[in-house]
Amino acid sequence: MVSEYKKAGVDLNKLKEYHTLALNTFQNSGVLKIGHYANAIKLDDKYLAMHVDGVGTKTILALKTGIIEPTGIDCIAMNVNDLVCIGARPLAGVDYLALEKPMDDVVEKVMKGLKQGADEANIEIIGGETAIMPGVITGYDLSCSVIGISDRLKTGEDVAPGDVILGLKSNGVHSNGYSLIRKLIDEGKLSLNDWGEELMRPTRIYSSSIIPILDKIKALAHITGGAFSKLKRITNYRINLKMPDPPEVFKAIENAGVPHFEMYKIFNMGIGMIIFVSKDLKDDIIEFLSKKETVYELGYVEKGEGIKITTYKNEILYI
């Protein structure tokens, strides 16, 4: 059965093939295996980490709604949140903005968003590239590269049965699944007038909340493309999750024609970051994170394999 995401033009299996090609081409190019949230090289007694990511097709909705600034925040968030997942503290970044034609208003608002995101993440934007490329770009494309530093990388190897899994509330859809969302809008199944403002909410920046307690955390997973299937990166043990009731925008997307289980393979469903912690540190970590974040106790790690998700409809999904 063809997934709704593939019908929208995003073939996750093909992306896996491309990841494998990159892995085979650039093997042994970093400390971690290519395909993790980020990678790093050894630099004296520390690790220099680097990550690149973009906003994707959310920019198309940005132009349609006129809500541009959040995409600048998205660009920062997608990078710093992934860097912190390998135990790195983000330091600085550069941006790449490609335009179909001169767009003064877009450039100004993107830069404001980038500045706001950088301030929230406590990083500096130290350079970038702006290009006008008619015939190559339609609208605009936005991406960033961010570097970070770490004394000890987090690979997930410390995760063990009995560990507790926490979830941090998302700010909405964030920056993934927009090709499918646009398809639903184009087909008249989802109203941009009703949901445009909600769909343009920026990706939440978690790094500044997490960094002060990074040494107490065993592993982290930023819920982006591939959604909860990416938890397989963290551990080979069985992951058990009971998901909370998601924000209404996800129910609207599901009601527009996306199968219930597929929602958890594409969207964050209200949880933007997952954190693995020791049971004895759980309460202290929840207390600290709750100062800035909405924290859910989602589940636990046990012996076995795979991912078991109890959805908000109390249906069981195995990944």
Swiss-Prot record:
GO BP field: 'de novo' IMP biosynthetic process; adenine biosynthetic process
Superkingdom of the source species: Archaea
SUPFAM superfamilies cross-referenced by the UniProt entry: PurM C-terminal domain-like, PurM N-terminal domain-like
Enzyme class label: ligase
Pathway: Purine metabolism; IMP biosynthesis via de novo pathway; 5-amino-1-(5-phospho-D-ribosyl)imidazole from N(2)-formyl-N(1)-(5-phospho-D-ribosyl)glycinamide: step 2/2
A GO MF label: ATP binding
GO cellular component, one term: cytosol
Pfam family, one: AIRS_C
Its EC number(s): 6.3.3.1
Main subcellular location: cytoplasm
Keywords: ATP-binding, Cytoplasm, Ligase, Nucleotide-binding, Purine biosynthesis
Keyword Membrane attached: no
Subcellular localization(s) per the UniProt record: Cytoplasm
InterPro entries: PurM-like_C_dom, PurM-like_C_sf, PurM-like_N, PurM-like_N_sf, PurM_cligase
Catalytic activity: 2-formamido-N(1)-(5-O-phospho-beta-D-ribosyl)acetamidine + ATP = 5-amino-1-(5-phospho-beta-D-ribosyl)imidazole + ADP + phosphate + H(+)
PANTHER family registered for this protein in UniProt: TRIFUNCTIONAL PURINE BIOSYNTHETIC PROTEIN ADENOSINE-3 (PTHR10520:SF12), TRIFUNCTIONAL PURINE BIOSYNTHETIC PROTEIN ADENOSINE-3-RELATED (PTHR10520)
HAMAP family noted in UniProt: AIRS (MF_00741)
Family membership noted in the UniProt record: Belongs to the AIR synthase family.
Protein name: Phosphoribosylformylglycinamidine cyclo-ligase
